[in-house]
Amino acid sequence: MKVLVRAMSLTVIGLCVCLILMHLLDYNVRLDELNKASHLAMANTQIVMQENIEDIYYNTNNSRMKIGSNEEYLKLFKDNFMILVNSDGTYSISGYSDVYKGLLCVIISHEYKNFLGQDKTITKKIINVIDVVRDNG
């Protein structure tokens, strides 16, 4: 009887440890995906914005796409971000952008259900400012 009780208690402890590890791994995988996607989307968005600023400064027409308003600037980030993520759940992206200063401040919230059915949220805030193009001549 003692052996059976010990075996059952070890089984329950093992299951609890497995559940805790699964919860931690699920959170870390989602956080890692959110970090990588947000930083890559920010870099891609800022490259396009830098091209726009250089077009204005050097009076050229070399940028991939024109960004004319703050809403377009934020929408470009959202599009770049949504292409990069592939986990389930919902993403809400809000923020502030300024086309003339090259400023982009974004708050990303990722809401998902973990393996136990609980609602979880991960939130990340990113701020980026483009350096001003200067004439060295």
Per-region residue spans from a language model:
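N-terminal signal-anchor/signal peptide hydrophobic helix marking the start
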Residues: 1-13
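Short amphipathic secondary-structure patches
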Residues: 25, 29, 44-116, 130-136
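Stable alpha-helical structural segments in soluble proteins, enriched in small hydrophobic residues
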Residues: 37-45
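Beta-sandwich strand segments
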Residues: 116-122
